[in-house]
């Protein structure tokens, strides 16, 4: 599949979607995007910058949601112009989709909304590639229906993203078999290595997380075979305004990416023996 000027798939090198969970300030966005663009450029990794202007599904109404549509899009536009990288952001049911699609390169649908048919199709009709996050409540094989809805709206640039599945209360687990199952949709599969270590609502009025397991799950996903990785990162995760407990430190991103790229080359170079069984 063509995506932002590069090809993605199991026959192509790993691509990266990364950035802070939410837009905090223009300077933080530019600094983070610049650092990520520099390291991915040196490593030969296709890169899309991610940040949200509004996090509509925060645990508490008192949690920081973002700067809002106008201010958030202005920051994302500056990232595109000044850093020269494509950008992706979340949209919701009440988002003015045309306005957002005029600024960003890729649209992302939240996991909780993956079953909302009208929403998925409206997003797909905007003429932008779409990254559809699989709900924490959804079986991986059920994503074929979600992809079919999006394609029925006339969009063939659809990706599917695994971000863990609910396991009891306030916990998620990642079943690596899901990555192979989701390939059967024909859409490129992305693994979200940071939300997969989230502990939803685990801090009472906020979600917790176990960022020490980000490299573990990222390595496992790349070994299983994915088109791309999604990782939220922050210069100081403990001070991040959203999802800090599961964000990967920006200063440690390069060393992790180097390992992941080596794994990706080995796995994709040898092929996938499970195919055709």
UniProtKB/Swiss-Prot annotation:
Catalytic activity, as annotated: D-arabinose 5-phosphate + phosphoenolpyruvate + H2O = 3-deoxy-alpha-D-manno-2-octulosonate-8-phosphate + phosphate
GO molecular function: 3-deoxy-8-phosphooctulonate synthase activity
EC number, UniProt record: 2.5.1.55
An individual GO BP term: keto-3-deoxy-D-manno-octulosonic acid biosynthetic process
UniProt xrefs under Gene3D superfamilies: Aldolase class I
Record flagged with keyword Transferase: yes
Enzyme class: transferase
InterPro entries xrefs: Aldolase_TIM (IPR013785), DAHP1/KDSA (IPR006218), KDO8P_synthase (IPR006269)
Pfam families recorded: DAHP_synth_1 (PF00793)
Protein name per Swiss-Prot or TrEMBL: 2-dehydro-3-deoxyphosphooctonate aldolase
Source organism (scientific name): Alkalilimnicola ehrlichii (strain ATCC BAA-1101 / DSM 17681 / MLHE-1)
């Amino acid at each position: 599949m063509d995506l932002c000027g590069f090809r993605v798939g199991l026959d192509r090198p790993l691509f990266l979607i990364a950035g802070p969970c939410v837009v905090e300030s223009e300077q933080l966005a530019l600094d983070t995007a610049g650092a990520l663009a520099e390291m991915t450029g040196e490593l030969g990794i296709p890169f899309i910058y991610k940040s949200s202007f509004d996090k509509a599904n925060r645990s508490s109404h008192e949690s920081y949601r973002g700067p809002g549509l106008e201010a958030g899009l202005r920051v994302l536009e500056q990232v595109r112009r000044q850093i020269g990288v494509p950008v992706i952001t979340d949209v919701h049911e009440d988002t003015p989709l045309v306005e957002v699609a005029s600024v960003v390169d890729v649209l992302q649908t939240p996991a909780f909304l993956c079953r909302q048919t009208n929403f998925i199709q409206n997003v797909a009709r905007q003429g932008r590639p779409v990254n559809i996050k699989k709900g924490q409540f959804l079986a991986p094989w059920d994503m074929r229906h979600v992809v079919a809805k999006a394609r029925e709206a006339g969009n063939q640039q659809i990706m599917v993203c695994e971000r863990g599945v609910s396991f009891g209360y306030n916990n998620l687990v990642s079943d690596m078999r899901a990555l192979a199952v989701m390939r059967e949709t024909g859409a490129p599969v992305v693994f979200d290595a940071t939300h997969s270590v989230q502990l939803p609502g685990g801090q009472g009025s906020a979600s917790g997380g176990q960022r020490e397991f980000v490299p573990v799950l990222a390595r496992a996903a790349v070994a299983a075979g994915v088109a791309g990785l999604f990782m939220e990162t922050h210069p100081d995760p403990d001070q991040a305004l959203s999802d800090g407990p599961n964000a990967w430190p920006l200063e440690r991103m390069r060393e992790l990416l180097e390992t992941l790229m080596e794994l990706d080359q080995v796995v994709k170079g040898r092929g996938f023996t499970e195919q055709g069984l």
